[in-house]
Amino acid sequence: MNKTITPSLETIERNWFLVDAKDKTLGRLATEIATVLRGKNKPTYTPHLDTGDFVIVVNAEKVEVTGKKASQKLYRRHSGRPGGMKIEKFESLQERIPERIIEQAVKGMLPHNSLGRQQFKKLKVYKGADHPHAAQNPVLLNS
């Protein structure tokens, strides 16, 4: 009988990947990113451990959606105060804070617990083509 080997946190190797969001569909891009953040692309994947890699996303303002979602998709947030619900369309949020669009799409695809919050911290999203992580030597993610 074979024994299942659970990787220890010291043996997990974390790589850095770079993703260019220019002209990519939002949902398809988010699923690829979430898979890498969770570590499901590795043979050492373990559901209860954070085995994922770091992901850097550039050109967040150039991500696309299909159909009429650009004018119809709504993003909601609440201040916590009575009557504090704010509703914003995709187009206006893309002009104001384009990073938040990708962050919310990926966050919804990660586990909704402390492990998911830990994995989400490894996502770095930037508006333009520049990022401050050149020292990590990120590898371009095949997408």
UniProtKB/Swiss-Prot annotation:
Secretion signal, residue range per the UniProt entry: none
Gene Ontology MF terms: mRNA binding; structural constituent of ribosome
Keywords: Ribonucleoprotein, Ribosomal protein
Highest taxon in the source lineage: Bacteria
Single GO BP term: negative regulation of translation
GO cellular component: cytosolic large ribosomal subunit
Annotated Pfam families: Ribosomal_L13
SUPFAM superfamilies: Ribosomal protein L13
Record NCBIfam families: rplM_bact
UniProt subunit comment: Part of the 50S ribosomal subunit.
PANTHER family per the UniProt record, alphabetical: LARGE RIBOSOMAL SUBUNIT PROTEIN UL13M, RIBOSOMAL PROTEIN L13
Similarity remark: Belongs to the universal ribosomal protein uL13 family.
Function: This protein is one of the early assembly proteins of the 50S ribosomal subunit, although it is not seen to bind rRNA by itself. It is important during the early stages of 50S assembly.
Name the UniProt record assigns to this protein: Large ribosomal subunit protein uL13
Organism field: Prochlorococcus marinus (strain AS9601)
